[in-house]
Every structure is written in C-alpha cells, then in structure tokens.
Regions:
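Conserved ABC ATPase signature
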Residues: 134-138, 142
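Hydrophobic anchor residue at the start of the ABC signature
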Residues: 148
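Helix-to-loop junction immediately C-terminal to a conserved catalytic motif
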Residues: 51
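The feature captures the beta-strand-to-loop junction immediately N-terminal to the Walker
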Residues: 36-38
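Conserved ABC transporter NBD signature motif
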Residues: 56-71
Length: 159
C-alpha cells in the first residue's frame, strides 16, 4: 500500500515550548487515521506544521513522496473555527469555490462547471439552500458543513 503521508523526526515549538518532539508516522492510502489526545497535546500544532502553517524545528514531511507545496492540490483540509475570519464578506458558495482555485487557476474566472461542482458539494452537505447566505450569518455547525463542502469539492487524495 502506498504511503500518502510520511513524517520523520518532526519537532516544533509553540510559544517557546516544544510541543512536538521527534514525531514519526506513516499514513497509507486507503486507511483512516485519527489524531487524538487531551487539550494542549499538540494536535492542532501538528496539523499546522504538516500544512506549513506553522514552522517546524526539525524533521521531514512528505505528502505522496514530495513536499506539501507540490502536493497541496491533493490534500483537503478543514480549518479549525478559530483560524477563520468569520466577518470576511463572503457567501457559502464563494467559500466552497475557494476549494477549486487549484483547478481554476490564479486570477481566472470560474466557469459554469466549477459553480456546478461547488453547488453539488453544498448539496451533499445539506447546505445548497444557503449558497448565497453570508458565512457570518450561519450557525457554527452550518459553517463547518460549508468548509467540509470546500474540502470535498477539491476531490483530494488525502483529507
């Protein structure tokens, strides 16, 4: 079975405290893996380091045998609520469309099929009726479903 994520000797700190120390693991294609632990154990920091949203002190991270930057389009991610600016003036459909920018291209207009893909993802999450609703006007659970739709529309190889 192919390795989709390989982490070796990963260490990172947060607020001058080392929270990850020599972390090693592999995730294989076709498997489901969970990251569990008590509050403050470093779960969120681990994900941020893997996605290059937080610097690592040492170690290597490979997605599909390459760097995250090169494999980014193959990875779907749902951010934690605290890392989203809920007052940013955008609607649910636009948030989901953001998941397609890797396919659309930088500074290009989305085509009709992109909107159809985004609407289908919203529909899968039971949120199609809220496509034009501002993200800030949704409940917390509805907001999370919109971000799940954004991850799903990417058609990623790793979520």
């Amino acid at each position: 079975m192919d390795i989709v994520l390989q982490v070796s000797g990963l260490s990172a700190s947060y607020l001058k405290n080392r929270v990850l120390d020599d972390v090693n693991f592999n995730i294989h294609a076709g498997t489901m893996t969970g990251i569990v632990g008590p509050n403050g154990a470093g779960k969120s920091t681990l994900l941020k380091v893997l996605l290059e949203l937080h610097p690592r002190l040492s170690g290597t991270v490979e997605f599909f045998g390459t760097t995250y930057r090169k494999a980014k389009s193959r990875v779907g991610y749902v951010p934690q609520r605290g890392s989203v600016d809920w007052d940013f003036p955008t609607n649910s459909l636009d948030v989901v469309m953001m998941g397609l920018y890797g396919q659309i291209g930088w500074l290009k207009w989305p085509r009709r099929r992109h909107k159809e893909l985004a609407m289908a993802a919203l529909d899968k999450m039971g949120m199609a009726d809220y496509a034009e609703r501002q993200i800030s006007q949704l409940s917390g659970g509805q907001q999370q479903r919109v971000f799940l739709a954004r991850a799903l529309v990417q058609d990623a190889d790793l979520y």
